Curated annotation (Swiss-Prot):
EC number annotated for this UniProt entry: 3.1.-.-
Molecular functions (GO terms): DNA binding; endonuclease activity; metal ion binding
Protein name: CRISPR-associated endonuclease Cas1 2
Family: Belongs to the CRISPR-associated endonuclease Cas1 family.
Co-factor requirement: Mg(2+); Mn(2+)
Annotated GO biological process: CRISPR-cas system; defense response to virus; maintenance of CRISPR repeat elements
Assembly and interaction partners: Homodimer, forms a heterotetramer with a Cas2 homodimer.
Binding site for Mn(2+): E155, H215, E230
Function as written in the Swiss-Prot or TrEMBL entry: CRISPR (clustered regularly interspaced short palindromic repeat), is an adaptive immune system that provides protection against mobile genetic elements (viruses, transposable elements and conjugative plasmids). CRISPR clusters contain spacers, sequences complementary to antecedent mobile elements, and target invading nucleic acids. CRISPR clusters are transcribed and processed into CRISPR RNA (crRNA). Acts as a dsDNA endonuclease. Involved in the integration of spacer DNA into the CRISPR cassette.
Keywords, alphabetical: Antiviral defense, DNA-binding, Endonuclease, Hydrolase, Magnesium, Manganese, Metal-binding, Nuclease
Record InterPro entries: Cas1 (IPR050646), CRISPR-assoc_Cas1 (IPR002729), CRISPR-assoc_Cas1_C (IPR042206), CRISPR-assoc_Cas1_N (IPR042211)
Record-linked Pfam families: Cas_Cas1
Taxonomic source organism: Pyrobaculum aerophilum (strain ATCC 51768 / DSM 7523 / JCM 9630 / CIP 104966 / NBRC 100827 / IM2)
Length: 295
């Protein structure tokens, strides 16, 4: 179970096996053993140390976000599946080509997801055929890519067509991580939630989040998390496109109402199939860790 807390002044405490959240929306109670993640999306939230301890004992994760949706920190148990051997396998894969093959797979899944989004929007796209053809060509180019640069070139070619289509659907000015319009702010916010889920699973799988296979390593940049999350970005894109006309921004940031609405919609999408995405992410991370040490 994922719990979103986005009300300024909300209080979180634990009592008799329950997590209690009190705020503007009233009082909510959740069995602690059913809680997987608690997402704190705004400032002014207080959580007791008793609640924090109870959540950690239950194996839950508490993630704190800034106003842009960027995860600022994650409270979780010391990693139980971390071994030096797994990280050594990961470091070897980063240089012997196996890591690049994983990165290609994740980029392929992202581009395929982008193409699926276009198919859903085809009746609203005047240039659907042109966009779809460009993305299909990028998929073919990716299949023969042998270097990180070639992978990124294929990814960029698909992105050019995809975001042009997205502009036609949403009316936003174009994809810009620093964009101050509601759609770009919404994409950043949704990706932040996805990033937190991926970061948690990478750590629990015993891998190093800061050593990736495609994104360049840089101090403080969780390169593996950024590589790993690529495959699920289109699901966030679809939610933001659906809410594009509802989202509002002030000074380049989503309003409180929009943050709450988007977070609820993103988590609803992540749990819509009956197989929660957080569980899928966790399984995939463990599968990768196992494969790196057996291949």
């Amino acid at each position: 179970m994922q719990i979103v807390v986005a009300s300024y002044g909300a209080r979180i405490r634990a009592k008799k096996g329950l997590l209690i959240v009190e705020g503007r929306e009233g009082r909510r109670e959740y069995p602690l053993h059913q809680v997987d993640e608690v997402l704190l999306l705004t400032g002014g939230i207080s959580i007791s140390t008793r609640a924090l301890r109870a959540l950690l004992r239950a194996g839950a994760v508490v993630a704190v976000f800034d106003q842009r949706g960027e995860p600022l920190g994650i409270f979780m148990k010391p990693v139980g599946d971390a071994t030096g051997a797994k990280r050594l396998c990961q470091y070897a894969a980063a240089t012997d080509g196996r890591g690049l093959q994983l990165a290609k797979k994740w980029v392929w899944l992202k581009i395929r997801g982008q193409l699926e989004n276009l198919k859903r929007w085809r009746r609203r796209l005047g240039k659907y055929g042109t966009y779809a053809e460009s993305i299909s060509k990028a998929i073919n180019a990716l299949a023969s890519a042998a270097t990180p640069r070639e992978v990124m070139e294929a990814e960029a070619a698909a992105a050019e067509a995809y975001w042009a289509a997205y502009r036609e659907i949403t009316g936003f000015p174009g994809r810009d991580q620093e964009g101050r319009d509601p759609v770009n702010a919404g994409l950043n916010y949704g990706y932040g939630i996805l990033k937190a889920l991926c970061f948690k699973s990478i750590l629990l799988a015993g891998l190093d989040p800061y050593v990736g296979f495609l994104h360049a390593d840089k101090s403080g940049r969780p390169s593996l998390v950024l590589d790993f999350m690529e495959q699920w970005r289109p699901r966030v894109d679809a939610v933001v496109a659906q809410l594009a006309e509802e989202l509002e921004a002030e000074n380049g940031l989503l309003t409180h109402k929009s943050r709450l609405r988007l977070a609820a919609a993103v988590l609803e999408e992540f749990n819509a199939t009956g197989r929660p995405l957080s569980a899928e992410i966790h399984r995939e991370a463990r599968s990768i860790a196992k494969a790196l040490c057996t291949s």
